[in-house]
Amino acid sequence: MGYPCEDLAGYKAGDPLPIRFGYTSNGERKYSLRPYQKAACEAFWAGGSARGGSGVIVLPCGAGKTIVGMGVMEKVGMQTLILTTNVVALRQWISELLDKTDLSPDMVKEYSGECKEIGPVTVSTYQILTYRKRGGKPEYPHFELFDKRNWGLIIYDEVHLLPAPVFRITADLQARRRLGLTATLVREDGREDEVFSLIGPKKFDKPWKELEEQNWIAQALCHEIRVDLSSEDRLEYAVADERDKYRIAATNPRKLEILKHILKRHQDDQVLVIGQYLDQLEGISTELGAPLLCGQTPNAEREALYQAFKEGRLKTLVVSKVANFAVDLPDASVAIQVSGTFGSRQEEAQRLGRLLRPKPQGDCAVFYSLVTRNTKDQEFSQKRQLFLTEQGYKYTIWEAQHFIEADAREMNTR
């Protein structure tokens, strides 16, 4: 039906698992919840009444949704299944659980394509759950994970990405407590209402700008820089069909010149170059001599690149869509978007969100979007920005040459 589901029938009691957030396994206190994180946990729990226990918490990237999940686990005090977007996010959850709760390693297990262990707290991915056996029975063999333990809580990380097959199995889990975590409930397929109907109503939502004003997330400056097509590419664009028009504009080779200029400006910063098209990103990676991280990158290499970036040994990282979701890169302060998934508002928000963890000395994060002027690329860019402009963000619009000239004047006055 698509109506928010408020479960008042009560919940199945899962197997107990006392958890203390903020304490190490030897009882040392290390962390405490921020005021808004505590409020989010209490809004979900509702004092343990039937009005709590299922719903969605919406917080910006960098505001500590994982920590809110752990705070809810402490309140529920039962065995928990956590579903994430990919193996990197899965291992980040495990690392955070072991660092910020009193759970020991033997209590937190990974269930993925590489390792299939089940424990009192099990972290898995949507990908392994939706793996299909060709011609086999059952169709989704890993759905049995939902019944392997008497889970008292299921956490859906990045719940706006919930795949359709998981929608179906979630409909059979209404007797269990369910927590959805997300930075934006925008779905480009228009199925936001199904998230509410299956997980529960929105329990807590904090505006991005409010957290920025309270210094919980970094201030962000957003720029759209418009680049022209060459005369040859303009001719090719004019005769192309609609889908090819976008690709021609989005992969405009002239974006490389402005990209190099921005990188020179931010040579001392940690920079992400983010795009949609692999051939474009491969060319940029080769031109810059910077590593490319994409869907084909093995998990071990992926984690090594993330680690090098976090430690400052790697200043520039070229990334595909794999970096859109649930990737913890706290030191990234600049993102340069060279192409995106058409008019995806959710993707734009997630990409800006990679930068929002508070910076040393209160420095601003800077987000650049490189767009080909008077094309489908510019048209889709305006759609992509809608969610962030509704949150109070403003984009400064530049023609490429004007940006270079203004930047040169600024550098000369330093």
Where do the PLM segments sit?
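Conserved interdomain hinge at the start of the Helicase C-terminal
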Residues: 237-276, 280-286
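Conserved segment of the helicase C-terminal RecA-like domain
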Residues: 354-385
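Conserved helicase ATPase core of P-loop NTP-dependent helicases/translocases
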Residues: 91, 107-110, 115, 272-274, ...
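Conserved pre-motif I regulatory segment
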Residues: 12-58
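Inter-Walker segment of RecA-like/P-loop motor cores
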Residues: 98-138
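Post-DEXD/H (motif II) to motif III coupling segment of the RecA-like Helicase ATP-binding lobe
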Residues: 152-153, 158-223, 388
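Walker A/P-loop
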Residues: 49-73
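A short beta-strand element within the Helicase C-terminal
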Residues: 318, 325-340, 366-369
